[in-house]
Amino acid sequence: MGEPRSQPPVERPPTAETFLPLSRVRTIMKSSMDTGLITNEVLFLMTKCTELFVRHLAGAAYTEEFGQRPGEALKYEHLSQVVNKNKNLEFLLQIVPQKIRVHQFQEMLRLNRSAGSDDDDDDDDDDDEEESESESESDE
């Protein structure tokens, strides 16, 4: 019962049924300001397109990571690698970023601060001088 599958999943033919709940897709579509009237036909097509896209993304991640080895579990890291490697998926970079460890993030912050502080120190000195000049002029 708990044995891994020996064959990859069988492709299902297109049907009039959806796996994603239509009401949830409608709610997500309504959250966009650009969305006008959402007819049942549009809702159905959008849901089917979303399902096909998710299938494509998961299939690409699975194939790239495991090749023809069946029974392996697909993980977040696999999806993020596919998103980061494929130019046509770069719109998902902020939604599916690659995971990094806390110490890596802290190091990135430290480097950004040190690089930013060098630039900011030069700019801040000029701003402070201008502020003190304008304050002395307003006092007179």
UniProtKB/Swiss-Prot annotation:
Pull one GO CC term from this UniProt entry. nucleus
The record's section on Gene3D superfamilies has:
Histone, subunit A (1.10.20.10)
Q: Where in the cell is it found?
A: Nucleus
The cross-references to Pfam families, in alphabetical order and at most eight, read:
CBFD_NFYB_HMF
UniProt KW keywords: Nucleus
Q: Which BP terms does GO give this entry?
A: chromatin remodeling; DNA-templated DNA replication
Q: CDD domains recorded for this chain?
A: HFD_CHRAC1-like (cd22924)
Q: Where is the composition biased (Acidic residues)?
A: 117-140
Sample GO molecular function, one term: nucleic acid binding
Return the annotated region ranges for Disordered. 111-140
Q: So what does this one do?
A: Histone-like protein which promotes nucleosome sliding of ATP-dependent nucleosome remodeling complexes. Part of the chromatin-accessibility complex (CHRAC) which uses energy/ATP to increase the general accessibility of DNA in chromatin. As a heterodimer with Chrac-14, binds DNA and facilitates nucleosome sliding by Acf. As part of the CHRAC complex, required for oogenesis.
Subunit structure of this chain's protein: Component of the chromatin accessibility complex (CHRAC), composed of Chrac-14, Chrac-16, Acf and Iswi. Forms a heterodimer with Chrac-14. The Chrac-14/Chrac-16 heterodimer interacts with Acf (via N-terminus). Stabilizes the interaction between Chrac-14 and Iswi.
Designated name of the protein:
Chromatin accessibility complex 16kD protein
